[in-house]
Amino acid sequence: MHSTRSLPLIRFAAATALTVLSVAASPPPPLGPLPDRVTFASADGQTNLVGYVFKPEGPHATRSPAVVMMHGRAGPYSSLANGRYDATTLSQRHQKWGHLWAQQGYLAILVDGFGPRGFPEGFTHQGYSQRPESVNEVTVRPFDAYGALAYLRTRNDVAPDRIALQGWSNGASATLATMSAATPALKSPTPTTGFRGALAFYPGCGLKGKFKTGLLPYAPVRLFIGTADEEVSPQDCSDLVDMSRAQRADLTLKIYPGATHDFDDPGASRQDIPANAAATRDAIAAAIAFFAAALRS
């Protein structure tokens, strides 16, 4: 039996433990200034999307180049969001890249294509076959990318003909479908009417069987994937790129030995893997150089 004198100590210890658990279960603090939340229409004509705008940091042009960012199957938010889905709970990876582009003088917008459709928490890898058609990365999400493109062109701080695209995992698959010259989301796309170029990080390259004979993008596309990817097939991507390049597609693939899925996630669980850290450094440098060339005036 505890004495009356020891009760305050017990209560203090319990309160401290609860505080520690609460902090541990909360998303990490923001990596920089919070992005602005905006809304805009998907090019599907029926979905009102949410976007998070990272504005250029430091000296920049009156009208800046821009990057549209497409999240993966887990959605744009931290796994620790705990029901709060806003700018304060964006995943570290999306924050990192948003601020990276802002530091390069670009405006970046992260598109939330899942939350407005009722799935803000995203999906697990295991449940791929059960995902609803409303978030199909090949037939639906490209319309979201072009909705973001149209929105950016209404802003007076964006260079309307200097906009690029980046996606991760499921969003990288959506990026590939978006960049196809045969995309249903934009008639007769060109680098002027569409995107100037695109980056696809560890996409699933099966693409619902829609591009079995190759993918012909209307602007340059660069893919990045690791040999130790646990979720998607590097071989599928290699086959897709080989078939596409045989038809003179401007599509290239960088394969990182030993790198996993999500290799660029800044969390310790990924960056403590040496192959991931090396792949991240190389991919960031390649991405910066690629967009510098693609988005120059």
Each model region followed by its residue ranges:
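Bacterial N-terminal signal peptides
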Residues: 11-22
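The feature captures the conserved acid-bearing segment of alpha/beta-hydrolase catalytic domains
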Residues: 189-255
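Bacterial N-terminal signal peptides that target proteins for export
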Residues: 2-13
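Primarily recognizes the serine-hydrolase "nucleophile elbow" in alpha/beta-hydrolase
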Residues: 76, 136-216
